[in-house]
């Protein structure tokens, strides 16, 4: 099979409320799949169900084609960062990670090597022997995320991994996640659509306990009739630019200019006409297609 995780028609009820109401999703192996949805949509419940912390009322789960989570089968191959995960206050960073690695089935030597590599990757070397209680919220979050990658598991699920991180450490974590692309299947739940768009190869829109739409990021955001130009300085207006580019409608939102055009024009042709005129304002990025936010807010999942 080409799927790392498959869930079919999962239902989880709490009294009359269905936290999962037919949640069906196949996560491709080697993908970074993002879950997008409102609070209470079912993202966290689905993750906890896949991880074996929550028992569904009905439906099927299979991880790596080996059925639902079983520690004897999946230890060392599957891991999770739960939302708002707590770490023992008196545990020391390196010792804690080594211990978690041992629980994943690693030898003492392998657990120590993996812990040391992750401590360095997450910029925690100067805190390796510090107790958790002495760490800031952001540092605790980095330790919690690091434990999910101990021993190079095949599947990692991350629930809000970037929340609570400062911009520098958030960027470091994004780079780390991207470095695992293809060799590790990663599922990320986040309310920050920019993060999902920067990280993910696939995206699932979740609402009312089910998946409304699952596509590649490219399929969700591709649109040959639109290009977004992010500029260092906002132009005083777009009328002159528009006059110089027949067939192109320009919309300005602060320092971003959107070009909208028909099928008779290509992205390359529009770039050739506009970019020379935008250079004086400093072009920071050129993004063909619509944003993930546009795709999500314009879809059924806004219900």
Identify the residue ranges that each predicted region occupies.
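Conserved ABC ATPase "signature" region
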Residues: 98, 102, 110-127
